[in-house]
Amino acid sequence: MAVLIGLSLRVAMVPVQQLLPKADPVLGLAASGVACLIALGIYTLLVRLGEDRWPGELALKPAAGQLAIGLGLGSAMFAAVMAILIGAGLYSFEWHGAAPAWRGAGLAMQSAVVEELLVRGVILRLLWRAFGPAVAFAASAALFGLGHAFNPGATVMSVVCIALEAGIMLGALYALTGRLWMSIGVHAAWNFTQGYVFGAAVSGGDFGPSLARSVANGDASLWLIGGEFGPEASLPALLVCGAVGVVTLWLAVRARRFGKEATAE
């Protein structure tokens, strides 16, 4: 059943903008929203059929609040990363002004929903149930990092950064809340702020029109700036996300959230 869920979500992961490159941007955003709803529906149906339960990790009552917190946290985290990079002279920043947000919003939303369902909802949750949280965190973080290994501009540093900063931190948010909503919010806001607000590469990809343009200082070391992969493969991103991840794990431990199941009752 886990394999079936994974394959279904992998199909839903294909960005609508790649399938409809010449479509109206607003239509593309709407199609991305539909893809997210389909992914959520597939996950819910297969969990219901395969595990004989309704997925508490997608409980609707806390969704709005946890999504809002996640969106705010993700935006603040990436803004902090760029403040460090720009302040240290590692990136230049040029404001462009108003730009359509449809493409960036669609990409951020779809990748966040589908990847969180697959990596935290399936891989982390089921490994946690089978082998405990330590193995689940290590394996899911490593797989998340390796999943970005073939992106444009990927390096060993980028794989390590994605595994540690996103794999651990997003998993910790799931562990703390027992839901997927906060990790979805952080994931979406991080990518949107990175690509649309600051105009930087997102995991080596182009998010389309942006409010500004951020360019790395070519003379700086790759591990400081992230190279073509983008700022998330930089040391400042690793430190910021690592700090949030450690604090979140500490809060989860204090809340006694490391039991046999990751999902809250």
Regions found by a protein language model. Give the residues of each.
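Function-critical hydrophobic alpha-helical transmembrane segments in multi-pass membrane proteins
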Residues: 93-154, 165, 172
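Functionally important transmembrane alpha-helices
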Residues: 159-223
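Interfacial transmembrane-helix boundary/kink motif in multi-pass membrane proteins
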Residues: 1-4, 24-37, 50-83, 96-104, ...
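Aromatic-anchored segments of alpha-helical transmembrane domains
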Residues: 6-11, 78-84, 141-150, 189-197
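Residues that define the loop-to-transmembrane-helix transition and helix capping
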Residues: 134-135, 178-181, 232
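N-terminal, membrane-interfacial amphipathic/helix-forming hydrophobic leader that caps
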Residues: 1-55, 195-265
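Residue-level signature of the transmembrane alpha-helical core
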Residues: 33, 71, 75, 105, ...
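Helix-loop interface residues and adjacent transmembrane-helix termini in multi-pass membrane transporters
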Residues: 52, 130-131, 153, 176-177, ...
